[in-house]
Design a protein with these regions (language model features):
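Short beta-to-alpha linker loops that shape the active-site pocket of alpha/beta-hydrolase fold enzymes
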Residues: 23, 71-75
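Short beta-strand element of the alpha/beta-hydrolase
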Residues: 29-41
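Conserved catalytic-core motifs of eukaryotic protein kinase domains, centered on the activation segment
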Residues: 47-49, 79-80
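Short amphipathic alpha-helix adjacent to the substrate-entry channel of hydrolases
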Residues: 49-70
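Helix-loop module immediately N-terminal to the HCX5R catalytic loop
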Residues: 84-88
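Primarily recognizes the serine-hydrolase "nucleophile elbow" in alpha/beta-hydrolase
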Residues: 89-101, 105-130
Length: 130
């Protein structure tokens, strides 16, 4: 497994995006998915590295997917909708760079746990609306 760090622009903010990729893909490129996994923490705590340690590694190892974990702006730094806008910017970047990252841009899964699950739901609605 390889880990990369990228930075994404989001409404004047620079957010970190951790990307984990398998050493070798278990499936053909057109079948390989990308997963945007959003960390929890009550919108006020937590970091992308939390995902790296737990869920992201498991997803990469078990399913051979590429996982991106955005370090969205926490609520004590800037209120809603900063976090969901950061996740949206991360999603756009992730899709635009799918070829470089080794997955099919038409096969993106968005998920999260706790507050990340709430951001996931808000992000899906935002993406549909835009």
């Amino acid at each position: 497994m390889k880990t990369y760090k990228y930075y994404v622009n989001s409404n004047g903010r620079r957010i970190k995006l951790l990307v984990l990729r398998p050493d070798r893909h278990a499936r053909a490129f057109d079948l390989t998915a990308g997963v945007l996994w959003i960390h929890g923490g009550g919108f006020a705590t937590g970091m992308a590295e939390m995902v790296y340690i737990t869920r992201a590694r498991a997803l990469v190892e078990k399913f051979g997917v590429t996982v991106a974990a955005p370090a969205y702006t926490l609520s004590w730094r800037e209120p809603y909708p900063a976090a969901v806008e950061d996740c949206y910017s991360a999603l756009l970047w992730f899709k635009a760079n799918a070829w470089m990252l080794g997955f099919n841009a038409d096969k993106i899964i968005v998920g999260g746990e706790s507050a990340g699950g709430g951001l996931c739901a808000a992000l899906c609605i935002l993406a549909r609306e835009r």
